[in-house]
Amino acid sequence: MAKKDNGPLVAATNRKAYHNYHILDTYEAGIELLGSEVKSIRKKEVSLDGAFVRIEGMQAYVFNMHINPYKYNTVTEVEPLRQRRLLLNKKEINKLKGHAEIKGHTIIPLEVYFKNGWAKIKVGLGKGKQLFDKRDAIKKRDLSREMEKDFKNKIKF
């Protein structure tokens, strides 16, 4: 019998990225990992807090992505915060590099997930939000929640 595909298995999301940045564009990239790191990601022992992407030469790397060491690993000890290479096309790297050089723009990892058995990372091109932008977003979110509550209460009666 064929195995059901329930969509991608999301291991970690970077919620602060959506709060601190306007996400202009997103890209899907593969990650160069060791075997024990893949096992840890499958167990959702990965954190994207403070992670960022930097392009060095013609390669993209993710820094500060914390992957807990797999506790049953006996072969080699893996550093949890090591830099990991992202697998992107040359065209995508050039595009990201050009946009990242603009003042106020940065490349941020948004999600780590599995797609067809392969570990992927969703990378976003972000522009930093100002304090008033963040306050605006919070006000809009609160207003929409209140409107939904009022609407639900009207339907009940």
Swiss-Prot record:
Q: Which UniProt keywords apply?
A: Cytoplasm, RNA-binding
Keyword Magnesium in annotation: no
Q: Which GO terms describe its molecular function?
A: RNA binding
Query: Which organism does this record belong to?
Result: Elusimicrobium minutum (strain Pei191)
Q: Which InterPro entries match?
A: SmpB, SsrA-bd_prot, SsrA-bd_prot_CS
Q: Which family does it belong to?
A: Belongs to the SmpB family.
Instruction: For this entry, list what GO says about its biological process.
Output: trans-translation
Query: Pfam families in the record, alphabetically?
Result: SmpB
Check the record and name the PANTHER family matching this protein: SSRA-BINDING PROTEIN, TMRNA-BINDING COMPONENT OF TRANS-TRANSLATION TAGGING COMPLEX
Localisation per UniProt entry: Cytoplasm
Question: Matching HAMAP family, A to Z?
Answer: SmpB
**Coiled-coil region list:** none
Task: Please report the name of this protein according to its UniProt entry.
Answer: SsrA-binding protein
GO cellular component labels: cytosol
Keyword Cytoplasm among UniProt keywords? yes
Q: What does this protein do?
A: Required for rescue of stalled ribosomes mediated by trans-translation. Binds to transfer-messenger RNA (tmRNA), required for stable association of tmRNA with ribosomes. tmRNA and SmpB together mimic tRNA shape, replacing the anticodon stem-loop with SmpB. tmRNA is encoded by the ssrA gene; the 2 termini fold to resemble tRNA(Ala) and it encodes a 'tag peptide', a short internal open reading frame. During trans-translation Ala-aminoacylated tmRNA acts like a tRNA, entering the A-site of stalled ribosomes, displacing the stalled mRNA.
Q: Which PROSITE patterns match?
A: SSRP
Where does it primarily localize? Answer: cytoplasm
